[in-house]
């Protein structure tokens, strides 16, 4: 009989290593800082360049003043009235007052009413859409203890749009009716203080908002006074 053949060993089959998945390119829409030095950061998003300027951190006086105003007694009644005063800064109250003045105040009232309403709306737009995105200061209740009444706003803190709107309207109104200036500015100051008392703004937020509002209100009054 022929000799039995020895079984041949088969060399193990080498499996090809799995190909590495191609690296995904960075999403151009993702916002990434390209320059960040000190208080200024430059971001690129979807081909657009945005400059972010960090406002100075609230100083010691600012913090102490916030703690004092925010720590004033809170009662159900007082919080309700302060909240109503704060709501005037949203602009609807000033716009409604300006519309009433424009309809009932004759030729002068029309100019004053329109100037007041436009100033209030313009200040709200400038602060909310143009200034706040540059200064991304967080709200007081984010990094420190604060008594917050009502809604906790999700946007940035600096400057105060409510205060800017109120001072803009008060300035425009006082330009046409100087005798109304004390009352108008008292309400505007009250709006700014209410924002601090409710725990949603630092005093410096309200102060800078007031300055911006005065500038916009002056321009609005001058514009409609000239056109009239």
Model-found features: residue ranges?
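Interfacial segments of alpha-helical transmembrane regions
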Residues: 102-126
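N-terminal transmembrane-helix/juxtamembrane module of multi-pass inner/ER membrane proteins
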Residues: 1-97, 128-155
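Membrane-helix interface segments
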Residues: 77-78, 108-112, 141, 178-182
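Small-polar-interrupted transmembrane alpha-helices in polytopic inner-membrane proteins
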Residues: 118-132, 182-195
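Membrane-embedded catalytic cores of phosphoryl/pyrophosphoryl-handling enzymes
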Residues: 103, 144-228
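Residues at alpha-helix boundaries and the short loops/turns that link adjacent helices
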Residues: 72-75, 91, 121, 125, ...
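Hydrophobic, aromatic-rich alpha-helical transmembrane segments
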Residues: 80, 84, 109-114, 199, ...
